[in-house]
């Protein structure tokens, strides 16, 4: 079984790598953003608690997020393993996750960090745009829709660029994320779980390197 966290700054290629990992290894992709939306829509106890913070414009406390993650990891669809997206973001959350995975007997097997030079990230992020309807992500450099002007996922013709993907905002965003990412990498390095992959390579080569690491777990 493979239980995985994929680390990397915005623009490092985590989304593309995640899709390929899920396709090959049939892991359950767990996104904290999706979990919050689902739990709030279903009005679960944790979902309503999270909503009370979000509605006031406050950050959801780590303990609430951790309960949501534990609830999701307890579901029966996680048979062949999971890939966590958006959690943990801090070492405090990493410690909470460690407790959860021990209780559920679903320990992490791998933490993979995609390393990309800051200049490359700025270039990639500034070229990123999204479908207004479904949120599918595209890139003017590396990932255009199959049919120009038409979203591959939903067929919409409306696209936009997020405010925080605009060049003037990107640099500051990367610095903030790196401050959060660096301690996490240290945390998992000490646990012997971390593998660093060169994210400057083509998506195919990045996945080839990830695949070489994960195939050792089977």
Curated annotation (Swiss-Prot):
The keyword Ribosomal protein does not apply. Residues 31-60 are annotated as: NMP. Its main location: cytoplasm. It catalyses: AMP + ATP = 2 ADP. One of its GO terms (molecular function) is ATP binding. GO terms for cellular component: cytoplasm. Keywords: ATP-binding, Cytoplasm, Kinase, Metal-binding, Nucleotide biosynthesis, Nucleotide-binding, Transferase, Zinc. Zn(2+) binds at residues 131, 134, 151, 154. Belongs to the adenylate kinase family. Consists of three domains, a large central CORE domain and two small peripheral domains, NMPbind and LID, which undergo movements during catalysis. The LID domain closes over the site of phosphoryl transfer upon ATP binding. Assembling and dissambling the active center during each catalytic cycle provides an effective means to prevent ATP hydrolysis. Some bacteria have evolved a zinc-coordinating structure that stabilizes the LID domain. Monomer. This is Adenylate kinase.
